[in-house]
A protein has these predicted regions:
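Conserved catalytic core of the tyrosine transesterase superfamily
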Residues: 1-314
Length: 314
C-alpha cells in the first residue's frame, strides 16, 4: 500500500468537486492536513470515524465551532470515498453541536481602513513581481465598491469587462447565477489602468487579474488571500473572528447600502430585492445574514429586513 494513500484519495476528491464548480480553498487546506496526518499515523488504512476524530480533536486549543468544521469536511470526503471503499465510515452529525446554527459576526470596514489597506499595498512590491501591489490595490478596491466574492473577482476575464457599458459579467458558479453588475466610472478607470499594466507583462492572459505567474482563478485567489492576511494583520477585527477577511468587504457593501437606504427613507423592500439579485443570491434569507444591525442608522433597516425576510416568498 502506498505511503501517501490518503493524500491520493484527497487529491482525487478535490479534483472531482472542483470540476462540479466548488472551489474548496479552506476545505482543501484542511483535507490535505488530514491526509498528511492519516498517512503518518494510519498509513494505508481507510477513513474511519475513529481516525477522523483523532485528527479533528488533536489540537486541544481548538474551539467547538472549528472542530465541527474539521469534521464537516471529513464527512464530505467520507461520503465520496464510501462509494469506492466499503470500509469507509461516515462520521455522524451532531458532534459538539451547541444548539442553533452559529454564524460569526463579520468585520465592517471603514473608509479609512480601506484607504489604509490600499495605500500600504505598495509594501508588497518586490522587484521580481512588479504587478503584485497593483493587483492587491485594485482587487481590494473592487471588492469594496462592488461586494463581489473574491472567488468571483479572480475569475473575471477580459471579455467580461465592458468598458462602454461600465459593467462586469459575473459567470455562474455553484449556487450563484450569471449576472451583469454596473460599476462606477472610477472603478472602470482603475480596471482599465490595471489591464494596461497587466498586458505589458502578460499579454496572452485572458484573466483580468493575474498572479506573478500570469495565472488567474484559484492560483491567484490563494496568493491574494495569503498577502491580504499579512497586509491586514494590524487591523483589530470588530466582529467575532480572530482576524479580518476579504469576505468582510461583501458584508460591508451590503451593510452600507442598507444603512444608506434607511437614512434616505427609501422603499426598503424594493431595494432589498435588488440587493439580493445584485449579490447573486437565490434566496432572500441568504442576503439577510450579510447585514449587520450594529449601527444606529441600521436599527430600523434591520427590523424591516427581518420582517420582510420572514414574510417574503422570494
Amino acid at each position: 500500500m502506498s505511503t501517501d494513500h490518503m493524500q491520493q484519495l484527497v487529491a482525487r476528491y478535490l479534483a472531482h468537486r472542483r470540476q462540479l464548480g466548488y472551489e474548496l480553498v479552506s476545505s482543501g487546506i484542511l483535507l490535505r492536513s488530514f491526509a498528511h496526518f492519516a498517512d503518518l499515523f494510519a498509513p494505508g488504512l481507510p477513513l474511519t470515524t475513529e481516525l477522523g476524530y483523532r485528527w479533528a480533536l488533536a489540537p486541544a486549543r481548538l474551539s467547538p465551532r472549528y472542530r465541527i468544521a474539521r469534521l464537516g469536511v471529513l464527512r464530505g470526503l467520507a461520503r465520496y470515498e464510501v462509494l469506492f471503499d466499503p470500509r469507509t465510515e461516515v462520521m455522524p452529525k451532531g458532534q459538539f453541536a451547541s444548539g442553533a446554527r452559529h454564524r460569526p459576526t463579520p468585520h465592517i470596514y471603514t473608509i479609512a481602513q480601506v484607504r489604509w489597506l490600499m495605500r500600504d499595498a505598495k509594501l508588497l512590491e518586490p522587484s521580481w513581481s512588479p504587478l503584485r501591489a497593483l493587483t492587491m490595490r485594485t482587487v481590494i478596491g473592487l471588492l469594496w465598491c462592488t461586494g463581489l466574492r473574491i472567488g468571483e473577482a479572480v475569475r473575471i476575464l477580459d471579455r467580461d469587462f465592458d468598458v462602454r457599458a461600465a459593467t462586469l459579467r459575473i459567470v455562474p458558479r455553484k449556487f450563484s447565477p450569471e449576472r451583469i453588475i454596473p460599476i462606477h466610472p472610477t472603478v472602470v478607470r482603475a480596471l482599465q489602468h490595471y489591464q494596461r499594466e497587466r498586458l505589458k507583462l502578460y499579454p496572452r492572459s485572458q484573466h483580468l487579474f493575474v498572479s506573478h505567474s500570469g495565472q488567474g482563478g484559484l492560483s491567484l485567489r490563494t496568493t491574494i488571500e495569503f498577502y491580504f492576511r499579512w497586509l491586514a494583520s494590524p487591523l483589530r477585527p470588530k466582529g467575532s473572528l480572530a482576524s479580518v477577511r476579504l469576505h468582510d468587504f461583501r458584508h460591508t457593501f451590503a451593510t452600507n447600502w442598507v444603512a444608506r437606504w434607511s437614512r434616505q427613507s427609501a422603499p426598503l423592500p424594493h431595494h432589498l430585492v435588488l440587493l439580493t439579485r445584485y449579490l447573486g443570491h437565490h434566496k432572500f434569507g441568504d442576503t439577510f445574514w450579510y447585514v449587520q444591525p450594529d449601527r444606529r442608522a441600521l436599527r430600523h433597516a434591520a427590523t424591516t429586513f427581518q420582517n420582510y425576510r420572514d414574510n417574503s416568498q422570494l
